């Protein structure tokens, strides 16, 4: 799903102050996660129960790496989970264009994640002009992790490649500071 803002005579430019999309889960699933952080994704993934995220957060942080999570219960997407019955659930986003990325903040009492958008310097979550769309919010459920990987949903929700000729693109190895 995503939110669409059609052109309106009296609404042209507007500010997103917050997005409160919620994902209510049915239990204390096993999750593979990294901390929600505005500045880096350079963390080792943690495998834990959802209820253990806050207690494991401090051990994941390396103060020498400029890591600053926004919350002790905040994680980045894509968030992969497995239920006790063996179903795999993934929460992510697609078509992220001119919009802040979505993190997820967990309420451990209810196992409900609320979207948390990366703010700009003024604390605003987004500046938009109609007509426009938010990114797609995706929830995938599959019987196995390999079925999750085989899904083309995220690819298909993104815009098609704007380049007509991609033959010149070749895979390479890179070592260095990016």
Language-model regions, residue ranges each:
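N-terminal small/glycine-rich loop or linker at the start of catalytic domains
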Residues: 170-178
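N-terminal accessory beta-strand-rich subdomains and adjacent acidic, glycine-rich linkers
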Residues: 1-167
